[in-house]
Amino acid sequence: MANDQHTELETEFTLDQVKDQLIEQGKKRSSLNYKDIMEKLSPFDQDPEQMDEFYEHLGDLGIEVVNENDEEVSNLRQGEDHDGNDNDDFNFDDDLSLPPGIKINDPVRMYLKEIGRVPLLSADDEVELAKRIMNGDEEAKRRLAEANLRLVVSIAKRYVGRGMLFLDLIQEGNMGLIKAVEKFDHNKGFKFSTYATWWIRQAITRAIADQARTIRIPVHMVETINKLIRVSRQLLQELGREPTPEEIAAEMELSVEKVREIMKIAQEPVSLETPIGEEDDSHLGDFIEDQEALTPADAAAYELLKEQLEDVLDTLTEREENVLRLRFGLDDGRTRTLEEVGKVFGVTRERIRQIEAKALRKLRHPSRSKRLKDFLE
C-alpha cells in the first residue's frame, strides 16, 4: 500500500534561482519564449497571479515574452476555412485526437462538435473583447470564453488517463478559462491563449492532485511525476527497453535517490480486494501475511492454556478467582487497579491486595503450578 506520508522533494534549484536564470537568459536575447518559461516553472506550485507578477517583472526589465510557436492556436485554426469563417464540419477527431486506446462517449462527442462550430477570434477581436470586459461587458466575457473552449480541450486531452474522466478534465479546464477571462489584461501585450494556457493547466493539474488519487499529492510533485513519465517513455523509445533509475536520473539531472523517491510516490494504492488468478476467486489480501495473527500451533497452545488456567482458577474461592480475573484482565483484556477492584467488591484496596496475594500463593503451589509450567517454556 502506498504510504500517505510523502516527503516533499527538494528541486535541484529553488524557484528564485530558476527565475534568475530565465531573467539572465532573457537579458541576453531581449526576449523569452513562453513555452520555455512554462517548462522551467511548471514543477513549482505557482499560482497564475504569481505568474502575472513575474511577467510584469520581465516587462519592467525590457524582456519580451514571445509566443511565436503557439501550437495550441495554430492547430485549432486548422478547423477554420481560409476565409476566416467557422467550419460547421469541424474535425475534432483530427484537431482534438486522444491517445490510443482512449474512447470518447456520446456526450463528449456532442460537446466537441458543438464547440467546433464556435468561430475563433483574431488578435484584434481579442483586444476589442478585452476592452469591453474591462468595462464590465458580460457578453464579451461569454464570447471570449466560448471562442477558447477548444483550447481547453486540446490541453485537457494531455491529461487523459491520470485518474479523471475526460469530461471532468474539460470541466476543470473551463473553470480555469473563466478565471483567465476575468483577469486578462490586453495592455500587457500577451495573446489571450498565452495567458489562458497557464490558468487552464493549473486548474486541471490541481484537480488531478486533489481528486484523482486516493492519497493526495502536492501539485508541484504531480508535475515532477509527469516529467519523469515523459522522460521514461522517451528513453524507452531510444533504448528499446525500460530505462533504469540511473538513466532517468541522468536525463532529468536529478540524483538517483530523488528519482527512486519520485517513483515510489508515483505508485498508485492497490486495493486488498483486487482479484487474483484466472478465476478471480482469490483476492490480493488473501496472500498478505497478518503479522499479528497466531500460527496454528500457537493458537492451539493458547486454547490449551486457557483450558488449564480455567481448571486451576476453579480450585480457588469464588472471590479469589474474580479478583484475579479483574486484576489481570483475564476476561476482557483490561487490567484493573486495586482501587477499581475494591469498589467492585465494596472493600478497601488493601483488602484486595491481601486477597490477590493469597490467591497467587495458592497458584504457585506445585499441585497447581505444574499444570501451567509446560506453557511457560
UniProtKB/Swiss-Prot annotation:
Where the record puts its DNA-binding region(s)?
338-357
Q: Where is this region: Disordered?
A: 72-92
Q: Where is this region: Sigma-70 factor domain-3?
A: 223-299
One short Pfam name that applies is Sigma70_r1_1
Positions of region (Sigma-70 factor domain-4): 312-365
Name the keywords, alphabetized. Answer: Cytoplasm, DNA-binding, Sigma factor, Transcription, Transcription regulation
* A single MF term (Gene Ontology): DNA binding
Q: Does the keyword tRNA-binding apply?
A: no
Q: Where is the signal peptide?
A: none
Question: What's a single GO CC term here?
Answer: cytoplasm
Please give the Gene3D superfamilies that the UniProt record associates with this protein.
RNA Polymerase Primary Sigma Factor (1.10.601.10), Sigma-70 factor, region 1.1 (1.10.220.120), Winged helix-like DNA-binding domain superfamily/Winged helix DNA-binding domain (1.10.10.10)
- Chain ranges for the short sequence motif Interaction with polymerase core subunit RpoC as given in the UniProt record: 168-171
- Recorded family membership: Belongs to the sigma-70 factor family. RpoD/SigA subfamily.
Known function:
Sigma factors are initiation factors that promote the attachment of RNA polymerase to specific initiation sites and are then released. This sigma factor is the primary sigma factor during exponential growth.
Q: What is this protein called?
A: RNA polymerase sigma factor SigA
**What species is this protein from?**
Bacillus sp
Which gene name does the record give? sigA
